[in-house]
Amino acid sequence: MGKMIYTIKPEHHGIEDIKKILEEHPEIQFVSFMGVDIGGNGTDEKIPVKLFIKDMEDMLKYGIQTDGSSVELQGIADLSDAKVDILPDMDCVWFVDYNYEYYNDDNGLPVGTLKIPSFIIHSGKQVCSRSILKRASLNFQNELMSLFKKYPELTKSYGFSHDDVSEIALTSATELEMWVKTPEQSADFEELHTSQVLKEQYWKRTMGTVRTVLEKIMTQLECYDLKPEMAHKEVGGIANRIDSKGRITHVMEQLEIDWRFSETLQTADNEIFIRELIEDQFRHHGLEVLFKAKPIEGVAGNGEHVHLGAAVKLKNGKRINLFAPTDMKAQYLSEIGYGALMGILKNYEVVNPIVTATNDAFNRLKPGFEAPICTVTSLGGSKESPSRNRSVLVGVIRDANSPLATRFELRAPNPYSNTYLVLASSYQAMLDGIDKVLDAGLTMDELEKELSKKYGEEGVYLEKFREYRSEEDVFEHYTEEERNKLYGKAPATVWENLSAFETNEMKQLVLKKGEVFTDELINSFKESTVQKWKNELAGRIIHDNIMLLKTFVKLHNEQDHATDLDVVNWEKIVYLKTKLMKDSMTKKCIFTKIKNALNEGDFDTASDLQKQMNEKMTEIRGLYIQYKNNIF
């Protein structure tokens, strides 16, 4: 049995190198060009490796053609102009995706597919998520070099000049949280909730099949040179159940897997591949993986913290973190760091629709589950001690003894957020803040004061009637009314979030700077997101709610020693069920009203009704648990 190859690095993307590698590895039998559409979906196809080798020069130069109407490029590639090209990216890592259920006859190794991250091109323009992030990265680097030339005193404070710069490196990192469970089995909500409150699972030892798969995944990440850093149990889940033969029969655990940072575009590519690898490994062992933001109502959801960094590489080989101050014990951040942080916070209204773009994502972003809903940051109580505030949107990660580790942590994304667009929009927002604060010429103390401004105070860059910094737990320290006043009222539905593009046109220009995003791309994203929102709301969420409500049946009768409390609770349940799902000749229920509003294109009304539905569904779930627990 020969040795498997897991990646092909950019330095080996020459035609002769690729041919040699493929001929030496007959287990690699297919090639797939992975373009990523505006919805964050990776394309996958199976091109026989013999055909790829035969036509390699043309395929690498011109790509392959496909029907763009089958991917999410609404408003760009439609039925009348559907042709798109998928063009290989020659400057990134290519992965070999192995099928461990199908083995090559020649050498006994698993059959592999060479996955080549690619760009989607329509009418000569790159229109995919990968291309947007690539443009954002180049725009950030080019604009920062221009600022270095414009403000020589800035680079002087770091100990270099713009002529000394070899490269501006944007580094990012993500992680994945997931629920792993036995298929077709579910755990009792109260059991899960109690285990979470008691922290019975957090960082506990994994056992059985879950341990085996987790260790296999970490080993495989090493093989792919993805530099895994940690895997552990998260707060959700319950203890495994074992049958009389010692076999685990019921699994319901929440896990987290972390790996090392990389260049921004490579970071997003890595995440897609790692997510697929994790799914394959658990499914191969008979377990289901849930990456949804909120797989189970009422217990911990899955977040995906996105880390954002920037550094310069000098021609002498030295690396300097641009967000770290020259004296870590005298200041929290550098001028560039303050500007970048304020840029995200000020422009988050147009970043948020990209970060939180699904009904599922909004199910997670609620008070009480360590999920951020307020546009606010925390610097820490003092320069020497880092902030540990987990209630904020943007965390500042810093270590006084390690300036290179300074970065920002955006805490709102989830595993199904489009990481390419999240990174692109975040770096565009950061660039706006950097440009504005450098132009204002603020001192370090003035920058800290600007970020720490109080509600009603005029800001040089930040808005007057907002606050942006809190060292308190914003959920414990403030009421909902106070949070809405200080940090702005958070959107509660996909439609409310998307509406921010229209109400914040000046901030939308921040995304378009350098033609990173265009009107065409933003409109395509909006159209795609609205379609998914309304189709899921009408076709899945309402249907699932109806199925759930039908399980809420009367349990008491006179023979069961029913009390007046049972009668009252049941009457409340019937009232809510009727309000939600039962029409009469003269009155429509909430579910019907939502469907009618969606069909009529009245999305404002549908969004308001969705909020009512969510509130009443939460109320009736809790009420039925109380009612059921009081029955003999």
PLM features per residue range, with description:
Residues 1-228, 262-276, 421-422, 427, ...:
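ATP/Mg2+-dependent ligation/transfer catalytic cores
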Residues 35-39, 159-164, 172-179, 234-242, ...:
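A glycine-rich phosphate-binding loop feature that marks nucleotide/adenosyl-phosphate handling sites
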Residues 227-234, 288-291:
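Short beta-strand elements
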Residues 145, 149, 219-226, 283-287, ...:
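Generic secondary-structure signature for well-ordered alpha-helical cores
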Residues 172-175, 179-189, 232-258:
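Active-site-proximal, well-structured secondary-structure segments within enzyme catalytic domains
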Residues 191-215, 249-416:
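Loop-rich catalytic cores of soluble enzymes, especially ATP-dependent carboxylate-amine ligases
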Residues 348, 352-492, 498:
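C-terminal catalytic subdomain
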Residues 104-106, 243-247, 396:
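Short beta-strand/turn micro-motifs at beta-sheet edges
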